[in-house]
């Protein structure tokens, strides 16, 4: 019988007095299980992405909920065919999602459920703000969303200044969303500090919206920081038309690849025909590089992690590949 796996996305903001002890306990519990993960723990709480054989994933969820600090944690679950991370990674990270500035986490925008969010979208009254990176929203976003041309989460505090100048914070209601919710937890205090009076955040992020509402007002696919890279937000509606384009021929495509030029390795969008024609490279210059690795079509578009886009900078949140 074929083994079945879960993909889990979760975070919890809570005081953790000894995060390094928590990390050690996690590693000990997970070491003999058929799982892979990328988990960050700090004094702020936990931010995790996880995959595992279903019984082992169930064990982990039960174990974590039995811990005093994490009894109220919520898991968002997808069904998958195999583990989607290369290994078990549990690390300390001071900022669970690297915003690059101190925030008062006690000041939060109002959480609204996916159903409430869907209803508010139809009112067409609020500014819909996507607080993900540009390469994420390029393949999928809410209809009529404001899409900041930003490559790392650290750029968003500066964007809040710009937004406050472009619209009146006193009278502009804002609905903000991200993949799983944690970036909104950290960014909503910034918007409130800039004077925005009416700010809402999508509880559980786009993942929860897809699971509870369906495709709804969402266009395209959802970028995820694991081997899948792009997924439909509704598992029952997998045939989603691409909203992005191949960088070579401009035909519709939502497939990201790492450039086969080892010195480039950038993420780029490409159709199936062009990825073979250009041997996995993002452009003509890269295809002529002496350090082009052989394109292996059997890997599909699985990330090449040695110098993946999500590892460009140790000082950016994209180094973690654990934004949800």
Swiss-Prot record:
A single Pfam family it belongs to is Rhodanese
Q: Which GO terms describe its biological process?
A: tRNA modification
The answer on whether this UniProt entry bears the keyword Calcium reads no
This enzyme catalyses:
uridine(34) in tRNA + AH2 + O2 = 5-hydroxyuridine(34) in tRNA + A + H2O
Supply the enzyme class, top level: oxidoreductase
- Example of a GO MF term: oxidoreductase activity, acting on paired donors, with incorporation or reduction of molecular oxygen
Catalytic center residues = 178
Q: Can you tell which superkingdom this protein's organism belongs to?
A: Bacteria
Alphabetical UniProt keywords = Oxidoreductase, tRNA processing
Q: Which PROSITE patterns does the UniProt record give?
A: RHODANESE_3 (PS50206)
The UniProt record lists the Rhodanese domain at: 122-218
**SUPFAM superfamilies to which the protein is assigned, alphabetical:** Rhodanese/Cell cycle control phosphatase (SSF52821)
**Keyword Glycoprotein in record:** no
Q: Give the family this protein belongs to, as stated in its UniProt record.
A: Belongs to the TrhO family.
Function text? Catalyzes oxygen-dependent 5-hydroxyuridine (ho5U) modification at position 34 in tRNAs.
Give the protein name, as stated in the record. tRNA uridine(34) hydroxylase
């Amino acid at each position: 019988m074929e083994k079945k796996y879960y993909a889990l996305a979760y975070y919890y903001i809570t005081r953790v007095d000894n995060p390094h002890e928590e990390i050690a306990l996690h590693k000990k519990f997970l070491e003999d299980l058929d799982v892979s993960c990328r988990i960050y723990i700090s004094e702020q709480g936990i931010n995790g992405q996880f995959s595992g054989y279903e019984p082992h994933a169930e064990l982990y969820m039960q174990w974590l909920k039995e811990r005093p600090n994490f009894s109220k944690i919520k898991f968002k679950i997808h069904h998958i065919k195999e583990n989607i991370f290369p290994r078990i990674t549990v690390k300390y990270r001071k900022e669970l999602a690297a915003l690059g500035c101190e925030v008062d986490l006690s000041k939060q925008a109002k959480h609204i459920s996916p159903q409430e969010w869907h209803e508010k979208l139809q009112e067409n009254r609020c500014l819909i703000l996507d607080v993900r990176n540009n390469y994420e929203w390029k393949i999928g976003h809410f209809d009529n969303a404001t899409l900041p041309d930003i490559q790392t989460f650290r750029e968003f505090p500066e964007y809040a200044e710009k937004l406050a100048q472009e619209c009146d914070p006193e009278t502009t209601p804002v609905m903000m969303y991200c993949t799983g919710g944690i970036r909104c937890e950290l960014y909503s205090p910034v918007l409130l500090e800039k004077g925005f009076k009416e700010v809402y955040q999508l509880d559980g992020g786009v993942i929860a919206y897809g699971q509870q509402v369906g495709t709804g007002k969402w266009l395209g696919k959802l970028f995820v920081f694991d081997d899948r890279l792009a997924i439909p937000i509704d598992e029952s509606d997998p045939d989603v038309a691409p909203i992005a384009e191949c960088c070579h021929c401009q035909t519709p495509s939502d497939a990201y690849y790492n450039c086969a030029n080892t010195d480039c390795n950038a993420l780029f969008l490409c159709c199936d025909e062009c990825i073979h024609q250009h041997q996995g490279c993002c452009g003509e210059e890269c295809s002529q590089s002496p350090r082009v690795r052989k394109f292996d079509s059997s890997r599909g578009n699985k990330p090449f992690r040695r110098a993946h886009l999500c590892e460009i900078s140790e000082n950016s949140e994209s180094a973690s590949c654990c934004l949800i």
